């Protein structure tokens, strides 16, 4: 299968403090890849670097044949990259509808507004609570609804490659389970590739096709999600169970 994303020799950090070291990654269309590891391993830094929020010091990021190094966030969004950060980034002063419309601001031309309207309608079909609260402001929503809104805003961009950082953080178990199940539905329906950082290792591996384990900024293991789940030594050494 042709790879959607290819990452080679990626190094990144903050100022003089390196975090990622020679990270290689391959993602195929229609797959979910879980990024696993302890706090401080470099998982969020990896997502920030791929989305364009952090400039790497070395390496290559190739999306469908296009090198993303040096491209700003907005350009990456236009090419099909969407990022749902930890903390969700919902703007509390804006309504649900206004937050969703932000996901389509990059579109230009006569049909841009119509295309965004159609994408927003599709999000409301996926997330009925948002449809019922489209006039509510972000600060009026529950944690689960804010996560739906953050994910929905990313989907308005119709991404090829979705980066998700801790989507279940702070959510009730039943809400977190529904969000995770939806990721599989989205993968199957859209064919997009998902890179998932998730604190709940069991939940992440349950929905993922592949997994990579990161320790001290390096990929120390990779493979099928079921194989990682079954590797007792790996679990004890890096995953805490």
Task: Describe these PLM feature segments.
Residues 177-191:
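Helical segment within the ABC ATPase nucleotide-binding domain
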Residues 15, 33, 71, 96-118, ...:
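ABC-type ATPase nucleotide-binding domains, specifically the catalytic core motifs of the NBD
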Residues 36-38:
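The feature captures the beta-strand-to-loop junction immediately N-terminal to the Walker
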Residues 137-141, 145:
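Conserved ABC ATPase signature
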Residues 154-155:
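ABC ATPase C-loop
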Residues 55, 67-88, 92, 113-116, ...:
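ABC ATPase NBD coupling module
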């Amino acid at each position: 299968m042709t790879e959607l994303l290819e990452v080679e020799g990626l190094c990144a950090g903050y100022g003089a403090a390196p975090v990622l070291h020679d990270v290689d990654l391959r993602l195929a269309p229609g797959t979910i890849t879980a990024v696993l590891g302890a706090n401080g391993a470099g998982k969020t830094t990896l997502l920030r670097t791929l989305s364009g929020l952090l400039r790497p010091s070395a390496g290559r990021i190739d999306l469908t044949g296009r090198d993303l190094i040096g491209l700003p966030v907005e350009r990456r969004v236009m090419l099909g990259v969407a990022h749902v950060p930890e903390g969700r980034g919902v703007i509390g002063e804006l309504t649900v509808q206004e937050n969703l419309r932000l996901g389509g601001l990059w579109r230009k031309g006569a049909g841009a507004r119509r295309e965004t309207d159609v994408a927003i309608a599709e999000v409301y079909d996926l997330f009925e609570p948002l449809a019922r609260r489209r006039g509510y402001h972000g600060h009026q929503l529950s944690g689960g609804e804010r996560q739906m809104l953050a994910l929905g805003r990313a989907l308005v961009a119709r991404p090829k490659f979705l980066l998700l950082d801790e989507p279940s953080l702070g959510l009730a178990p039943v809400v977190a389970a529904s969000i995770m199940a939806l990721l599989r539905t989205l993968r199957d329906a859209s064919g997009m590739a998902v890179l998932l950082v998730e604190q709940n290792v069991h939940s992440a591996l349950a929905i993922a096709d592949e997994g990579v384990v990161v320790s001290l900024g390096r990929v120390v293991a990779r493979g099928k999600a079921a194989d990682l789940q079954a590797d007792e030594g790996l679990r004890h050494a890096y995953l805490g169970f």
